[in-house]
Amino acid sequence: MDKTMEKEYKWRADEKLLGQALLWASSRIGSQSRTINMESSYFDTADGLLKEHQAALRLRRENDRSVCCMKLRNTDTPDGMRAHEEYQCEAVSLLDGLRRLPELGAPNDLCERALAADLQEICTVSFRRCAVLLQEGDTVCEMALDEGKLRHNGKSAPLCEIELEYVAGSEDTFHALAAELAQQLDLVVEPTSKLARAMAL
């Protein structure tokens, strides 16, 4: 996989809203859904090397796949859209992923420093995702309905949220779909990432 500038909207949810969002998506032509069981472990050094660089490093089991991912913070917007650089590859371990990510465009210096450091698991996020691929004309986006648990330092909290991620086509159409979904379901923006919420426990 290659570098992408990930663009997504994120909203708070409960079981009722997840069901309503699925109905909204299912009523649209060209929707396809699949279920993925996600087990994410996030890593950093004791002195917060990745946090210092506004980066997140995770190893995630996605059904039968193991994926290493590095995200670099970019911008957030008031209406809930988040944009950040994302580099990811299939990897059997965190170290395997860190060795491969620079080939895909991830910062070589940061990956080398992380490889040489004592990386520790700082939190975990386990959830089931219902992923729905939506097509509107030539625009493709993916809606994710996530429900599970955030865990950190022996504490846990429920996770329930809706995401809409841009895949291809017109960004204007993507933003319009997000606005329609948020308005129809009266959604509230989720301003913080899964990692940030887990670390706040």
Predicted features and spans:
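Phosphate-end processing signature that detects enzymes handling 5′-triphosphorylated RNA
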Residues: 1-201
